């Protein structure tokens, strides 16, 4: 999907982008704020302009992927069956033009061509116990952190919200960085320490089997700390150096791989207020968990704009997987009917118990193999209602016949979702610049593998042309 590069924008252009984003989000708030499971109960299709309904009605999933989301299959040419209204074309063009580009600036052969489960860019010891998505993420972010550390003269990397320690382990034992790993869950830390020891033993065995491999110095596994990082207070542990040197002060680089909600905000605030922290590389996620207020907006500029507010539903939608859904649309698989079935179930729930709105429904296996009435019966049971309630099967079948409309409305919301994510991340960029620091956003992961793929990079001093090194991929 095309978009705008944050790197190519001046400070004033970034501020103007925030103005444009708040205007557009306000204009299409009714779509962004809608819950797809209320498609029938709230007549969401009827909220669209009639001309939009005519243009979108009857489009099959692959056509939606190509014409609306702008993601045709390779070699496919977009062919419109009718002239779309200018307002719908404007929505599409605006969504493309104002969202940060999610395509990395480098193009390399897929690391999973030979084996979909094993990255060809990571050695076997670092792939063990690591899912393909995470293999891709730790390699890309780890290599960027290594370059950023070298450019800024950092003496220590602090990985916040480190989980099982996969990123910390790669940075320390794979890239030779001094790493402190901070995680609030004791069980995850204990598992990380076990994996550290397992990897160390594997590397030692490899050295014995292959004497030509020369280890240049002692290996330093990550130093693990069990600690919750409170976004509202300074975490002293985060700032303590691993090694004290009387000659120089510690220079810290903070990083977080998909630091959840306010944890990403905590990294920004520690970077801003602590002189020991000279660099930051943060990939955020779970925007709906941001404190309101406190987590957004951070910048004075965005806070002063009319329409800046992003309620829970909009922030939840910003955690989109646009590329993955477009691929599902192109395949037109039966799993696409899940939203339609769930929306039909909501109509039955409201009739049976009107005060019960949007209850969570535990996963119903193999939905696409069920008749809609069978799905509704299982869904009723999962929300604590009588599964043998009399059902209007004709009404349910009429809902099922609108499956493509449900998919079309969801696709519209998904088209707009990157604008909300862009506004959240742009607010963080502007916040850092308001504090007098240098900040950029880079697409670092393949969006098909990792939807939250934009890394916020910040430094206390300018990097100049050297910053371009962070956009390249190691051979």
Curated annotation (Swiss-Prot):
One of its GO terms (cellular component) is membrane. It is a single-pass membrane protein. One of its GO terms (molecular function) is rRNA (adenine-N6,N6-)-dimethyltransferase activity. PANTHER family: CGI-41 METHYLTRANSFERASE, METHYLTRANSFERASE-LIKE PROTEIN 25B. It is found in: Membrane. Keywords: Coiled coil, Membrane, Transmembrane, Transmembrane helix. The chain crosses the membrane at residues 406-426. InterPro entries: Methyltranfer_dom, METTL25, rRNA_Ade_Mease_Trfase_CS, SAM-dependent_MTases_sf. This is Methyltransferase-like protein 25B.
